[in-house]
Amino acid sequence: MPNILKNRDTTGAFALIDSLVRHGVKHIFGYPGGAILPIYDELYAWEKEGFIEHILVRHEQGAAHASDGYARSTGNVGVCFATSGPGATNLVTGIATAHMDSVPMVIITGQVGRSFIGTDAFQEVDIFGITLPIVKHSYVVRETKEMGKIVAESFFIAKYGRPGPVLIDIPKDVGLEKFDYQIVNPNNINLAGCPVLKNYDQNRISQAANLIKQSSQPLLYIGGGAVTSNSHNEINELINLVKIPVATTLMGKGIIDESHPLSLGMLGMHGTVYANYAVSECDLLIALGARFDDRVTGKLDEFACHAQVIHVDIDPAEIGKNRTPQIGIVGEIKDFVRDLIECLKNDINFDSEQSQAWRSRIIRWRKEYPLLVPKNINNLSPQEVIHEISTEATNAYFTTDVGQHQMWAAQFIKTSQKRWITSAGLGTMGYGLPAAIGVQIAHPNEQVICISGDASFQMNIQELGTVSQYGLPIKIFIINNKWQGMVRQWQQAFYGERYSHSNMEKGAPNFTKVAEAFGLRSLKIKSRNDLKLRIKEALDYDGPILVDIQVIADENCYPMVAPGKSNAQMMGINS
């Protein structure tokens, strides 16, 4: 350790930063303030010595989303800082986003001094209580000597089993207090009460294999848990062995190469026709790391209603929560799939050709109901734009905001595991840009693309300042239809075309000038003649760039499963 750090007082703040470094933390996203200043003062010395880097965002919500994007793209724990009061409450949406999508994060907030807690002191907020429903665990550090242990436990909890966010609230005087700091080994954490992560044996594997052998119309249903488990290789081996079609959720996107003949793309509300038909007609549904949420299932009692279900998840609370399976497996998806493959390989009675007629039927659906890229004579369609971006950008990381553009991106962008970063469960507008910042910090030599809408982008537009300050070469594409597009679509379809406060044209900023005000390069695309050339120009540019793309205002995102309808009852398709 350099002398500048050896000679520092071992305060609570020192213990915190030292513990973070020992846990391999390289980057922190945050915004300083009064209650957390002792920690920022300590951070100053550690940054100066190159141990760690802090990324200054322009709003605490941006810090939460950036650490979220960092975590999703690396598989490591994302870390963010904020001060007490409004600084802490500004994190709440980002914490909830991570909680809904099972993202490992450690959130560190400043708090008023211990003697002031409960007195309504300046910038005092009970962030511990506020966030209880949206974290895996929370701590208030009341004893400075507990700092190292609390940090170690927080990292363990954030990653153990089903990942999620953990909050550490640190009173100001704890950060300042000197004490005899005892280093806690990050590898020596063993918390009592942690649930067993496996409930199956070889007999359960054999039962699952028997269901596969009996099935003539099987389907794999892959969720975000499969991505988190790093089971890409095992799942692809299973797909090729069984010759089983696979549909993914929004979070499961990337687990299989979407050009694979057995890939059906996304299922659910805006899924492909053939994925939704397949789940409606299958006789066996194997759900891996998926939670049967409403946006996937449509009318729940008609979801995979002809199928027996095998449900595998690391979280026992998910098994049977929305759909009772014939076989419920709690365990690591990677381990289960590996065991299942071994069982099937050793079974001389297993024949993948028994589902040949089923695969042929799906091929016919694909030909009959392809995803279409409409080309309007006078104006650009959003689908055309996103398809062109996907065609030009190879092996990029993609982040999105939330709305129509998110669904079109999910339909048309072909990407791989952990290169698709989006807010799925909470559906957080304003997520895309700060998440892209986190991804770019984590992968400085990779191309990072943020696809946003004109409404979503304005939610966290201030983070252009962070992009500018750190020279992050993010490519930002705004699909600009001058509407809250998904809201308008629902108002058109279900609310008698009463467009209550969903039009964004009046007061809309000139995005290219806003970008330029932050010192960033910008482009505007209005016609098809410019589309391919300008997109390539943006992607080839070696710095940050914002591209404002004017698209058809009233284009709707189809297919669409209306609320209360089954997945087989889709709007916007030719029947």
Swiss-Prot record:
Residues at which Mg(2+) binds: 454, 481
Q: Where is this region: Thiamine pyrophosphate binding?
A: 404-483
Q: What keywords are assigned to this protein?
A: Amino-acid biosynthesis, Branched-chain amino acid biosynthesis, Chloroplast, FAD, Flavoprotein, Magnesium, Metal-binding, Plastid, Thiamine pyrophosphate, Transferase
Instruction: Name the CDD domains on file.
Output: TPP_AHAS, TPP_PYR_POX_like
Q: Which PROSITE patterns match?
A: TPP_ENZYMES
Instruction: Give the cofactor binding note.
Output: Binds 1 Mg(2+) ion per subunit. Binds 1 thiamine pyrophosphate per subunit.
TM ranges = none
Gene Ontology MF terms:
acetolactate synthase activity; flavin adenine dinucleotide binding; magnesium ion binding; thiamine pyrophosphate binding
List residues binding thiamine diphosphate: 60
Q: Which reaction does it catalyse?
A: 2 pyruvate + H(+) = (2S)-2-acetolactate + CO2
Q: In which pathway does it act?
A: Amino-acid biosynthesis; L-isoleucine biosynthesis; L-isoleucine from 2-oxobutanoate: step 1/4; Amino-acid biosynthesis; L-valine biosynthesis; L-valine from pyruvate: step 1/4
Residue positions annotated to bind FAD are 162, 270-291, 313-332
Q: Which InterPro entries match?
A: Acetolactate_synth_lsu, AHAS_TPP, DHS-like_NAD/FAD-binding_dom, THDP-binding, Thiamin_PyroP_enz_cen_dom, Thiamin_PyroP_enz_TPP-bd_dom, TPP-bd_CS, TPP_enz
Whether Plastid counts among this entry's keywords is: yes
Its localization reads: Plastid, Chloroplast
Task: Set out the biological process GO terms recorded for this chain's protein.
Answer: isoleucine biosynthetic process; L-valine biosynthetic process
| Subunit structure and binding partners | Dimer of large and small chains.
**Entry's PANTHER family?**
ACETOLACTATE SYNTHASE CATALYTIC SUBUNIT, MITOCHONDRIAL, THIAMINE PYROPHOSPHATE ENZYMES
- By what name is this protein known? Acetolactate synthase large subunit
Q: Which source organism does the UniProt entry give?
A: Guillardia theta (Cryptophyte)
